């Protein structure tokens, strides 16, 4: 089965009456695999990536979302990579607990970007963010270093 065929299968079998493809609750813990790669997602609607518990690194990169992108309540024992994301409406990155580094770089948001209640044991990298709306960064706890630079914000920068 190709990835294109898999997408067709998932839509045909998991789309509900509201038009949502619900893949929540997938459990790979009992499978003999090294990783699950969810990079490169392209979604015409909204994309929810929440309540994920990862013992290694979590890579959420190269994503194009024409609606809202929600990345919240994520617990990562390694590093969390949220880079090269393009979002048409709003990007929410909230309530993330990361034992390693959190990388939120090269993000382009046509609406607002909300980064709230992020707890990072390592370093937090928030660089090269392009936001046409408002950029909200609040209640971030970082035990390592905080790197913020090259922000281009057309709206308000709310820290």
Regions found by a protein language model. Give the residues of each.
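The feature captures the LRR N-terminal capping module
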Residues: 1-21
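Tandem repeat scaffolds
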Residues: 15-159
């Amino acid at each position: 089965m190709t990835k294109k065929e898999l997408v067709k299968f998932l839509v045909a079998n998991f789309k509900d009456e509201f038009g949502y493809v619900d893949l929540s609750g997938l459990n790979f813990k009992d499978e003999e695999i090294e990783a699950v790669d969810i990079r490169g997602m392209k979604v015409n609607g909204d994309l929810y990536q929440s309540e994920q518990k990862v013992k290694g690194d979590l890579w959420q990169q190269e994503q194009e979302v024409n609606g809202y992108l929600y990345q919240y309540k994520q617990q990562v024992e390694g590093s969390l990579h949220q880079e090269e994301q393009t979002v048409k409406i709003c990007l929410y990155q909230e309530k993330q607990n990361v034992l390693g580094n959190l990388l939120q770089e090269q993000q382009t948001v046509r609406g607002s970007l909300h980064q709230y209640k992020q707890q990072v044991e390592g370093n937090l990298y928030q660089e090269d963010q392009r936001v046409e709306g408002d950029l909200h960064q609040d209640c971030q706890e970082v035990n390592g270093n905080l790197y913020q630079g090259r922000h281009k914000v057309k709206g308000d920068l709310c820290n």
